[in-house]
């Protein structure tokens, strides 16, 4: 299981967005899921999910939780 450490703040900085996107991509590939699979299960568009993987999207904590659940990631909040 991959782990992502979320720093509790109002918004993620560019480095944090990229780190989360990279972890999401690795986890998705390990589960043999497509971006479309994850997007549908997490209730978001494929384009938005692709932006998350590239570290380009502003990501709410609720959306992050949806992705974490689909990808079976562990999240630590500090």
Report residues per predicted region:
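Residues in the helix-turn-helix
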Residues: 48, 58, 77
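Short alpha-helical DNA-recognition segment
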Residues: 32-51
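The DNA-recognition helices of helix-turn-helix-type DNA-binding domains
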Residues: 45, 56, 71
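Residues that mark the N-terminal boundary/hinge immediately upstream of a DNA-recognition element
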Residues: 23, 34, 60-63
